[in-house]
Amino acid sequence: MDPFFLNTQHVELLVSGKQSSPQDLLGIVSESLNQDRIVLFRPGAETVFVELRGKIQQAESHHSGIFSLPVMKGISPQDYRVYHQNGLLAHDPYAFPLLWGEIDSFLFHEGTHQRIYERMGAIPCEIDGVPGVRFIVWAPHAQRVSVIGDFNGWHGLVNPLHKVSDQGVWELFVPGLTAGACYKWEMVTESGQVLIKSDPYGKFFGPPPRSVSVVIDDSYEWNDSEWLEERIKKTEGPMNIYEVHVGSWQWQEGQPLNYKELADQLALYCKQMHYTHVELLPVTEHPLNESWGYQTTGYYAPTSRYGSFEDLQYFIDTMHQHGIGVILDWVPGHFPIDSFAMSGFDGTPLYEYTRNPSPLHPHWHTYTFDYAKPEVCNFLLGSALFWIDKMHVDGIRVDAVSSMLYLDYGRYAGEWVPNRYGGRENLDAIRFLQQFNTVIHEKYPGVLTFAEESTTFPKITVSVEEGGLGFDYKWNMGWMHDTLHYFEKDFPYRPYHQSDLTFPQWYAFSERFLLPFSHDEVVHGKRSLIGKMPGDAWRQFAQLRLLLGYQICQPGKKLLFMGGEFGQGREWSPGRELDWELLDISYHQGVHLCSQELNALYVQSPQLWQADHLPSSFRWVDFSDVRNGVVAYLRFADADAKKALLCVHHFGVGYFPHYLLPILPLESCDLLMNTDDTRFGGSGKGFREPEILTPEIARQEREAAGLIEADDESGPDCWGLDIELPPSATLIFSVTLQ
């Protein structure tokens, strides 16, 4: 045989498991002008048979597992198949051309490949009419990369990939494989260590702890075209989000509902409760239940805990058909240290940020991503685009943005390295977030992005062109913390904390805000929403109804974590369902009905959501009554509107048959909502017809009440509104201004 085929260096590298270019030795090799030779590598095999154009022939055996068969010139990969030791008859992987091209390489290493999810990982495809799976992975520091699985006995020498570029992309087409095949990567590092890794670009995984990657065939037939076409029109509409953890919303026979079971039930529930969107705690694959999904190992894969890849597509499709948008929690800020996943992927910190003395984030004991590497940014960008394109999600909420923006987040002096200007901002992360928002908004108009960001970093929701990060909305963590801090105070102490309610209005229009009562506020000893409220049971439920009304009335989009809408008593736990049996108790029924009607009023009232990021949508009426804990304001749909909503919140426990508010001149005032309604479990007060008082009469009433002296010329010369004010309640009036 021609010595070329037994080139000592090639064979030694192949047998030792360090061959980076098996395609140079294996497959169809030209032997002469008239003859080719099929060269095969079957470690451990004594004989190998080849089916060549319908005839079975035995290949010649050489040393070290090398076999070959001389064939006529011009044979094609489709002309022969090889018998494997398990009896499988399949085409030769090394006879097919490599498809990773120069454009792929340029875009990926530049960090701008917008369809990388169709190129990396395990992609079912046909090459020259032969079906199979194309495997591609980025591992620049590996000596050898193999795909292992049931199809090759998990033997790392059988299917080594070919290194198609000096920048570390490896590829192999394995004919005959279909959806459902399990696989992992086996790598030999520069030091010779053998690593077994799951696929960072894997689209599905087996359950922990095995965590094998699974080939999927994305063939779901969607039925939501009408929703997608109309989606862009909904971006300026009402947004009332129900935050859901899939595994603990509702159980059946001791197990969480799967994606399909959940779909119809949750869609109908959201419609009944007038939620416009659901936001899912991460359904990306993750090894630890207790992480709630926030320690992700499968950035392109729905978790298998609740069903298949197609089942989640069905869930989202069903939500859309019921008119409910789907927002995904997504974690590009850090990833877990589990050795089977991305950490030390090719024997080096490939995805990890390493410039700090300790690579681990002090808050979560996880690795942060290195946004200076274009390939890492492309991995993350591709993940977001995958969920929008292949799973039809309508929004992406980026978790822990603050930890991405600041190099010193959670770290003390000496534990972090400043940027090149000596500052603490992570300039690479800022560029990535700008790229993320720019690409999504250009490619998918109508898809929304949300930032969970807890600092005063400027311009979170300002466009990238104007120097901002480009998010659509920022979670207003300050409003949430101040509001809950106030509500947790017992009633005698609230007058000293009125600024918790008024201060957020100073910055309420500095960004486009979303007002969350999220899962983070009902765990780890923080107590449930109802558990935060002071007083006896009646007062606690009255305060919860007041809180829900306060959130609905405030400027900004809305988010409520599941269970808050009916007064879940226990803290949330991912290991059990919500306490739905509480809905058999009248107090909880009342809160549930109150929440439902508040939501309905919200989505039907443009004053509560139209232009709610503009100062013109809000006007104070009065916040001076600190002693009684009363604040009132007007909400407008546009600056010139005569129609408005008057929102009055009484945070105290007193009852006022006649309470006088200073007000602009009114033509009419009608009560729309009273959270003290007996139907909600309230006292039934506050339903007296409001009286509009002229300035003269209003002044007389103030004098009679001792609010001003009779000869006081500095007193307010304004109209008044005499209302019945119930204890611990939100009142919402429809008013027409003169």
Curated annotation (Swiss-Prot):
Q: Name one process (GO BP) from the record.
A: glycogen biosynthetic process
Q: What is its EC number?
A: 2.4.1.18
The active-site annotation reads: 399 (nucleophile), 452 (proton donor)
Which leading EC class covers this enzyme? transferase
Which Pfam families would you find in this protein's record? Alpha-amylase, Alpha-amylase_C, CBM_48
Q: How does it assemble?
A: Monomer.
The record's HAMAP family line, in alphabetical order, gives:
GlgB
Q: What does this protein do?
A: Catalyzes the formation of the alpha-1,6-glucosidic linkages in glycogen by scission of a 1,4-alpha-linked oligosaccharide from growing alpha-1,4-glucan chains and the subsequent attachment of the oligosaccharide to the alpha-1,6 position.
Name of the featured protein: 1,4-alpha-glucan branching enzyme GlgB
Organism this protein belongs to: Chlamydia trachomatis serovar L2b (strain UCH-1/proctitis)
Q: Which gene encodes it?
A: glgB
